[in-house]
Amino acid sequence: MAPPSPREHQSAPATGATKPDAEMVLPGFPDADSFVKFALGSVVAVTKASGGLPQVGDEYDFYRSFPAFQAFCETQGDRLLQCMSRVMQYHGCRSNIKDRSKVTELEDKFDLLVDTNDVILERVGILLDEASGVNKHQQPVLPAGLQVPKTIVSSWNRKAGEYGKKAKAETFRLLHAKNILRPQLRFREKIDNSNTPFLPKIFVKPNARKPLPQALSKERRERPQDRPEDLDVPPALADFIHQQRAQQVEQDVFAHPYQYELDHFTPPPSVLQRPQPQLYRPVEETPCHVVSSLDELVELNEKLLGCQEFAVDLEHHSYRSFLGLTCLMQISTRTEDFIVDTLELRSDMYILNESLTDPAIVKVFHGADSDIEWLQKDFGLYVVNMFDTHQAARLLNLARHSLDHLLRLYCGVESNKQYQLADWRIRPLPEEMLNYARDDTHYLLYIYDRMRLELWERGNDQPVQLQVVWQRSRDICLKKFVKPIFTDESYLELYRKQKKHLNSQQLTAFQLLFAWRDKTARREDESYGYVLPNHMMLKIAEELPKEPQGIIACCNPVPPLVRQQINEMHLLIQQAREMPLLKSETAAGVKKSGPLPSAERLENDLFGPHDCSHAPPDNYPVTSTDGTMPLQKQPSLFDEGKEETSVDARCLLATAVITLFSEPSTEEAGKTPLTVAQKKAQSIMESFENPFRMFLPSLENKAHISQAAKFDPSSKIYEISNRWKLASQVQKEPKEAAKKKVAEQTAAREETKEESTAAVLEQPIPVRQQAALENATKKRERATSDLRTIEQKQEKKRLKSSKKAKDPDPPGKDFSPYDYSQSDFGAFAGDSKSKPSSQFDPNKVAPSGKKCFGAKKFKQSVGNKSMSFPAGKSDRGFRHNWPKR
């Protein structure tokens, strides 16, 4: 029953002449058809052999009772499982089919077998499609030279064959020295990580057009500040003097030391002309010097003072320091390259201020936004007359603005970014890292020449574009380093970025952990990412573990400082768990942004978001010049009026109001004359005709139109134009007369009031007379009101009497009372023999077994209608029915 071997199949006479092994598709088979036939025969033979085994049931149990059969089955089963595992492993599937527990052994093995079959059959289908031409290999659309390079997300990514230059893959690794001696320990000056604003380190100001403030001088820093308490002055005056001095010192200290020089800087005329690009020297022919001593640094400064331009770049490290460390400075001239060890010369780097602040020397940077701040933070260095190639690339609208792209575009050099994430604190530096740092500035001056030429040509042979780049570079030089300041609400900024909602306990834990991380990072001089990364801190705040082991479980890998101070963190978590569990509204309360104003239609020509002339003047308080305190419009000693509530300035009324066509009030019409625009508007309003009052007969002249005139067009026009008038025209005269009368009355009242007030002012009246006058006026008003009410009542009585006189009562008829003796009262008695109602009555009392003979028998009909209604059908409409039992 064993299947034939490939050798037997090959030696069979049916195969014919055999081909060489090199031409065979598979070893021992000349073509695919022969292999398929052989495999199919093997599968059929195996299927027949498996069918000859004892079936599951009594027969199999009987054979299983023999030890030889049991051992044979186990041996062959293991062999089959091993073969199946090899096939699974070959196709990349899970191959641990033998390592299964006894409980779910059969189900797990069957699931693995099904998954493997699916993978194999899917792969077979793909290969068959490719062989038949349905699915072909997809070739890249772009040529090799235009392929987008792979982005290096982190140091362990692989970069294979970039731009077809390197066929062999290169592995990028983060060169981080774990056991390196911290360079902060060798610094002469201790790093200031305190929670205070940054104090500039400069104490000598070369190339100064405005002297350095005395507060920044070295003598002033070394000597203690003289307090006014030492003087013979009162304590209050001493505090005032100290506040004034501190305010002036604060303004001088936190200002940019070269603010005046940069504001009055103009590029030299030589750099605003058409440049002649000077080609860079080959790297092999250019000398490279490593500056690591004070004498070499002084010599470098002298060489830089004799140059017209030089390129500068920095290498920074921020993972093992709170504020970061500038580890290396690369400087390149037209003929030499210099690499300055800034960790060794940290306290002496101020010497380079003489060349960096010289306005006659051009300093070429690329992306100097961070470099300017690092120079200020670590060395107290400032830059004047800088050209940033990154800003030039943005102005030229290049495809990319990186230095790598500029090197490829202008120099044809492929930069090696293998050491981009290296730890630059390593000493001594390897040769590869030195070459990498050198390449960043070696070609930068040639790129500077080429970009200036393109800017000159783009500006039509005018230095307009060049001046824009120098202006942007000057703005970058004006940047100041700002130290991160911790406040009680600093955690909210990070909390809003996470887009996760935390309750009161979780938010308290997040706040406490954020404060602990900031304090630990400042004390240990480590970065936030080294002490406790953001995602780990948020995970701990969400979980609120009860045990220290839970905190460690939330961190993978566990930061060293977390493992070292796990007990302190556990106490913070316990403190947060003691808080009441509420919904957090802290983050929402901090954002005090009011509701957005309603969007105004842009097609409105009169809309202006900053036009508040139409708003009433009393809506908003008048603010002071500095915008801090609202000013009172009419100051008074005793203000009895209501306090004006301050309205938020964001509630700006932006709706245009046209008051030209509004009718003036009767009181204002007599006072102020109409303007020319208002007169024109009034004439326009009078010319408008009301369509609801047109073609009405006149109220005064009730003309009769003949029926014959309707058919005559001339007479019809005549009748309409002469005898029919608008009702509005008839009503114009009485309205105008009424307005004039009201205006005259108001004017007369005001005149009498003015005369009375003038008389009172001229002749002062005593208090008793004033009270008597007030009582007299009140009595007059009451009397007049009583007379009016009496007259109104009398008029009503007259009207009633007149109506009665006009409508006499009709003659009365003979009245005959109704005879109730003939009526039938049976409708109100009810039917005593009525059947019990089929409807359920909730008021009915269930009959009890005992009978009360002494009481009177009173049977109330259940379900009958009320006695006040007849027995017939009611016309009330819907009737509520009780539910049936």
From Swiss-Prot:
Glycyl lysine isopeptide (Lys-Gly) (interchain with G-Cter in SUMO2) crosslink site(s): 19, 583, 710, 833, 859, 873
Listed InterPro entries: 3'-5'_exonuclease_dom, Exosome-assoc_fac_Rrp6_N, HRDC-like_sf, HRDC_dom, HRDC_dom_sf, RNaseH-like_sf, RNaseH_sf, Rrp6-like
Annotated positions binding Mg(2+) 2: 313, 315, 440
This protein's record includes keyword Flavoprotein: no
Chain ranges of the HRDC domain: 503-583
PTM description: Sumoylated by USP36; sumoylation does not significantly affect EXOSC10 nucleolar localization and association with core exosome and USP36, but regulates the nucleolar RNA exosome activity in rRNA processing by promoting binding of EXOSC10 to pre-rRNAs. Effects of sumoylation on EXOSC10 levels vary between different studies. Sumoylation of EXOSC10 is required for the modulation of EXOSC10 effects on cellular protein translation and cell proliferation. Sumoylation is promoted by mild hypothermia.
A molecular-function term among this protein's GO annotations: metal ion binding
Binding positions for Mg(2+) 1 per the UniProt entry: 313, 371
Needed co-factor(s): Mg(2+)
Annotated EC: 3.1.13.-
Domain 3'-5' exonuclease span(s) in chain numbering: 289-455
Glycyl lysine isopeptide (Lys-Gly) (interchain with G-Cter in SUMO1) crosslink location in chain: 583
UniProt KW Nuclease keyword: yes
Stored SUPFAM superfamilies: HRDC-like (SSF47819), Ribonuclease H-like (SSF53098)
A GO cellular component annotation in the UniProt record: exosome (RNase complex)
Phosphoserine: residues carrying this PTM: 821
Disordered: annotated segments: 1-23, 210-232, 730-885
Pfam family, one: PMC2NT
Tissue localization of expression: Expressed in testis (at protein level).
Compositionally biased spans, kind Basic and acidic residues: 1-10, 217-230, 732-756, 776-794
Similarity comment: family membership: Belongs to the exosome component 10/RRP6 family.
Job description of the protein: Catalytic component of the RNA exosome complex which has 3'->5' exoribonuclease activity and participates in a multitude of cellular RNA processing and degradation events. In the nucleus, the RNA exosome complex is involved in proper maturation of stable RNA species such as rRNA, snRNA and snoRNA, in the elimination of RNA processing by-products and non-coding 'pervasive' transcripts, such as antisense RNA species and promoter-upstream transcripts (PROMPTs), and of mRNAs with processing defects, thereby limiting or excluding their export to the cytoplasm.
Subunit organization: Component of the RNA exosome complex. The catalytically inactive RNA exosome core complex (Exo-9) associates with the catalytic subunit EXOSC10/RRP6 (via its N-terminus). Exo-9 may associate with DIS3 to form the nucleolar exosome complex, or DIS3L to form the cytoplasmic exosome complex. The RNA exosome complex interacts with cofactors C1D/RRP47, MPHOSPH6/MPP6 and MTREX/MTR4. Interacts with MTREX; the interaction with MTREX mediates the association of MTREX with nuclear RNA exosomes.
Protein name: Exosome complex component 10
Organism of provenance: Rattus norvegicus (Rat)
